[in-house]
Amino acid sequence: MNKPVSISRTYPRLAVYSQENFRGLRRVYRGNLGIADIDAVLTGIESLRFFSTNPNATLVLFDRSRFRDNFFILRGNRSIRELDDILRRGDVESLIATNQRLTAAQVRRIQRTGNLPPGYRLI
């Protein structure tokens, strides 16, 4: 008699690549997290894929490290071929990926304090 199998998946799933167009080295992260310095991961992230079953999942891109300065909020699944083309004023230097809907006020609080909400991993 076969036993039922239970599979648990953690969202969101963030796949980051060291080169544009989803090439080069790849690393996959799961769960709510913040990457404080993109250059410290794979010697720089050039493209990414963000996936969640929640349409309100949020990806926040910052143009300075440690979640500072200007930010851009994206909702839902995203495939970004060239990360540095997203922000008009500069390169993406840090990001937050979460399965929750982050409001602009919550992002400004993170920006002001430099601290992620409870339960988030800091990379």
Briefly describe each language-model feature range.
Residues 1-123:
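Compact beta-sheet-dominated domain cores in extracellular/mature segments
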